[in-house]
Amino acid sequence: MNVWTTLFVAPLVLAAPVGMAGPAAAGPYDGSRPFLCAVTAIMECAASGECERHIVTDETAPAIIKVDVPGQTISTGTARRSALKSAARVDGQLILQGSENGRGWSATIDEETGRMAVGLVDNDYTFSLFGACSLP
């Protein structure tokens, strides 16, 4: 079983709509238009405290993620498309969240620089993803 697919892609399959909040003036990654994010690093940590770094490849994890807050979706290069559960703008950060199958995830994207960090949480392990976003 591919743990990445189970933990990252599956939890993104959500059903609730997104509501944006925050001031009108913001950076290019404020969620007002779609953008792409490249995953550059993945860390998997077990409940035992052992961690392992994973190489990002399209076979084990999506290297590119499309974030479309107005369309309320996150999608990968495959046919996978997921609804966002919540989105908020807080102190210059776009924060996206969701949950499914007993797992939760949260992504924080800097509105000015596009730097991204994602946390995926399960009872037995966590994944931390890092990357950078760009406008298409």
Language-model-derived ranges and their functions:
Residues 107-109, 116-130:
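Short, exposed beta-strand-loop hairpins at the edges of beta-sheets
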Residues 1-11:
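Bacterial N-terminal signal peptides that target proteins for export
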Residues 69-105:
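Contiguous, well-ordered beta-strand patches that form the walls/edges
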Residues 31-71:
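Short, solvent-exposed loop/hinge segments that bridge or flank secondary-structure elements
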Residues 67-71, 89-93, 108-117, 135:
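Short, solvent-exposed coil/turn segments at beta-strand boundaries
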Residues 14-23:
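C-terminal segment of classical bacterial N-terminal signal peptides
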Residues 130, 135-136:
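Glycine-rich, low-complexity intrinsically disordered segments
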Residues 22-34:
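Cleaved targeting-peptide boundary
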